[in-house]
From Swiss-Prot:
Domain of life of the organism encoding this protein: Bacteria
One annotated Gene Ontology cellular component of this protein: plasma membrane
Membrane topology: Multi-pass membrane protein
Assembly and oligomerization: Each stator complex is composed of 4 MotA and 2 MotB subunits. 2 A subunits and 1 B subunit are thought to form a single ion channel, so that each stator complex contains two channels.
Pfam families linked: MotA_ExbB, MotA_N
Keywords: Cell inner membrane, Cell membrane, Chemotaxis, Flagellar rotation, Hydrogen ion transport, Ion transport, Membrane, Transmembrane, Transmembrane helix, Transport
Organism: Agrobacterium fabrum (strain C58 / ATCC 33970) (Agrobacterium tumefaciens (strain C58))
GO BP: any one term: chemotaxis
Transmembrane segments: 3-23, 27-47, 165-185, 197-217
Protein name in UniProt: Motility protein A
């Protein structure tokens, strides 16, 4: 919603201010200049990035528009799954725990948290490290170092669309100048025309410079910033898993270990301790009620 509101304010102020100065709106309508700038920017974007990053950039923009960040229910689902697994680690046999992590789709623990099960990467992350805990030979600081390395790699991959879109946005002002120069070249071909005709042609050419700047600083870079915000918040789920499991490996009981994970959540989004306790008593309770 913020993106839509921001775009309305941006274009409303630019176009409204221009018309209030007495400008004519039809002069700004230059579809071929937009084609030059947008096409050159998109072509460079495709050349500069692997197809996987190109596709992920489209997905990331969709997430930014929908603001697909974890909500309280998502955090509670993660904490609920971790609590159930840690409880079973203390009370049940290795075979029973392996049944959950080998086939999470069929596990009652993961089925109670559909938002976790839907996130295949996060589910795999949880299962991999619970499996290492079951083995029992690894020390907590070794697991923590391994987790840090994987989490850093995941974040690096998740932010590739941000860097790719930012780079494309930074190129638009220069591409806008290219479009403007091409417009001036066209105008020079009619140098013998009247000043009214030449003025219109040169004005149309200058629209290219304006479009390049607007595409960069008012559209592309703000969208990239929103992509970074969304992807970074999604990444927070991995930090919760890491802090919780490491606390458990260091000797904390499951209830206390959950607090290590809960405290990593931003104050604006952190579920209350009462909500977490309710989740421990009834994992996925809200989902079942729904």
């Amino acid at each position: 919603m913020n993106i839509v509101i921001g775009l309305i304010i941006t274009f409303g102020c630019i176009i409204g201010g221009y018309m209030a100065m007495g400008g004519h709106l039809n002069v700004l309508v230059q579809p071929f200049e937009l084609m030059i700038i947008g096409g050159a920017g998109l072509g460079g974007f495709i050349m500069a990035n692997p197809m996987k990053v190109v596709k992920d950039s489209g997905k990331a923009l969709g997430e930014a528009f929908k603001h697909s960040v974890p909500k309280e229910r998502n955090y509670l689902d993660v904490l609920g799954v971790l609590y159930s697994l840690m409880r079973d680690l203390r009370t049940k046999s290795r075979n029973e725990i392996e049944a959950h992590i080998d086939n999470p789709e069929e596990s009652s623990i993961f089925q109670s948290a559909p938002s976790v099960l839907k996130n295949k990467e996060l589910t795999s992350f949880i299962c991999d490290y619970v499996r290492l805990i079951i083995i029992g030979n690894a020390r907590s600081h070794e697991i923590e170092a391994l987790m840090d390395e994987e989490i850093e790699t995941i974040l690096h991959d998740k932010l590739k669309p941000y860097h790719a879109i930012t780079t494309m946005g930074d190129s638009f002002p220069a591409i806008g100048i290219v479009a403007a120069v091409l417009g001036v070249i066209k105008a020079m071909g009619k140098i013998n025309e009247s000043p009214e005709v030449l003025g219109g042609l040169i004005g149309a050419a200058l629209v290219g410079t304006m479009l390049g700047i607007i595409l960069s600083y008012s559209i592309c870079n703000p969208l990239a910033s929103q992509v970074k915000i969304v992807r970074t918040k999604q990444h927070r789920l991995y930090i919760i898993v890491k802090q919780t499991l490491i606390a458990y490996m260091n000797g904390s009981v499951p209830q206390v270990a959950l607090e290590y994970g809960r405290k990593t959540i931003s104050n604006y989004e952190r579920p209350s301790i009462d909500a977490v306790e309710q989740e421990m008593m009834n994992p996925g309770g809200e989902n079942k009620a729904a």
